[in-house]
Curated annotation (Swiss-Prot):
Protein name: S-formylglutathione hydrolase YeiG
Gene3D superfamilies the record matches: alpha/beta hydrolase
This enzyme's EC code(s): 3.1.2.12
Originating species: Escherichia coli O1:K1 / APEC
Any one GO MF annotation of this record: carboxylic ester hydrolase activity
One Gene Ontology biological process: formaldehyde catabolic process
TM region positions: none
Gene name, Swiss-Prot/TrEMBL: yeiG
Length: 278
């Protein structure tokens, strides 16, 4: 591992690291915020997954999460949104290829060689964080848009791994919206049954009651992608039918930007703290 930068921030440290990923077959960067140490108890971790076109720095520089994370004593880990590099398959569109990994394991060539973000987030990155930093094994997960989709599927596919999950403007039903259909048909092929294991709504309908965890979703009603790409009401209906403990908040006037995330990130951190710090 190589440290790329480090900044003092709210008595803690904001760092950026590069490491060689055996899962993704390329070098990867991640950002991490380490809160000021409280006592000898290792702090819990909140993983943040960003959206289309982003990397590990968007949340770090725009969301303003460090102040509250420092106060609460929560480590923030921000991975990149896809594998990177000249040898990694790419696409000219903003919504496919590098910067648009969709947090799944691709099965189709040429994508399958590198696009295994799900395995990276489930196994390799948490093991790296555990081995290199003083953290507890308690963790939660959150994300925005494509990253909201990522956070939800990570939680739904891994019962017991996360204490709680939250999302801002998530893509909840990728099997049925243009962003998801484009990505899934490219990464996973045309068999739509294979898509279902990466769709939050399908996963929630298939979930067991004992695996439900507290879930918070914020969605702006002035989001230009709300009707065509996001459709949170579809997941809310799945949660209602499954009695899943989900709160969906529609925030009047807010759009899809980091101004929206910055406005409510404190709520999300305090929401996760209730369960992380138990």
């Amino acid at each position: 591992m190589e440290m790329l930068e480090e900044h003092r921030c709210f008595e803690g440290w904001q760092q950026r690291w590069r490491h060689d990923s055996s899962t993704l077959n390329c070098p990867m960067t991640f950002s991490i915020f380490l809160p000021p140490p409280r006592d000898h108890t290792p702090p819990p971790v909140l993983y943040w997954l960003s959206g289309l076109t982003c990397n590990d720095e968007n949340f770090t520089t725009k969301a303003g999460a460090q102040r509250v994370a420092a106060e609460l004593g929560i480590v923030l880990v921000m991975p990149d949104t896809s594998p990177r590099g000249e040898q990694v398959a790419n696409d000219d569109g903003y919504d496919l290829g590098q910067g648009a990994g969709f947090y799944l394991n691709a099965t189709q060539p040429p994508w399958a060689t590198h696009y295994r973000m799900y395995d990276y987030l489930r196994d390799e990155l948490p093991a790296l964080i555990q081995s290199q930093f003083n953290v507890s094994d308690r963790c939660a997960i959150s994300g925005h848009s494509m990253g909201g989709h990522g956070a939800l599927i990570m939680a739904l596919k891994n019962p017991g791994k996360y204490t709680s999950v939250s999302a801002f403007a998530p893509i909840v039903n990728p099997c049925s919206v243009p962003w998801g259909i484009k990505a899934f048909s490219t990464y996973l092929g045309e068999d739509k049954n294979a898509w279902l294991e990466w769709d939050s709504c399908a996963l929630m309908y298939a979930s067991n009651a004992q695996d439900a965890i507290p879930t918070l979703i914020d969605q702006g009603d002035n989001d230009q992608f709300l009707a065509d790409q996001l459709q949170p009401a579809v997941l809310a209906e799945a949660a209602r039918q499954k009695a899943w403990p989900m709160t969906l908040r529609i925030q009047p006037g807010y759009d899809h930007s980091y101004y929206f995330i910055a406005s409510f990130i404190e709520d999300h951190l305090r929401f996760h703290a209730q369960y992380l710090l138990k």
